[in-house]
Amino acid sequence: MARPQTDIDAGRIALLEVVDDLVRRRGSVDISMTDLAAAAGMSPSNLYRFFDNKEALLEAVAERFFAEKIQIMVEVTESDLPVQDKMYQYFARRYLAMVAQYEAEPDLLKSYLEIGQQYFEVVRGYVDLGDHYLSLIVAEAMEQGYFEGLSIDEAVSLINQMVQCYTNPDALFYVGTIKLRVEKLATIVETIFLGLGKKSSAQKLGQTQIKIVS
């Protein structure tokens, strides 16, 4: 007899908590379905009622890891904030969510980041989703005359490089939260709109007074 979907969902949530416990104890060591079944006190065949295979398990882990950040991206892009505030909150709120994870359990976060590197194909879609929502903000800014002469992809690429320390969770470990303050991020976002503002163009950017090294 098939389990009701509510039971399946509850079982998956409980199993993801077991995954957390395994990662806390073992770090980023690869977790097999057999390991998870043993830790959960169930047979492997019963485990497959909740996750069809290891890929499905990894996808569920990634979905939970990124869930709050996706909610933030949706809320910010759908808000009525001025476009500069929208871009700031888009980065700042996700950064603060990462800081909360880091301060709560830094070792657990580090282990999950290492797992994400091992299975990047699983998390790639979430990385691309971040660019998608940023593109919506950039497009809105372009409608107001910002980033003139740049394509959406060009603007997104430049912006991502400028705020990289606030979007890369690894930076929390080698830069730290004391230096990575949201007040600095606000200044960076303001500078983005000033430097790539309404009078900016691809031609102007190509005529920089800085001598390019080769």
Residue ranges and their predicted role:
Residues 60, 64, 74-100, 156-159, ...:
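Hydrophobic alpha-helical connector segments
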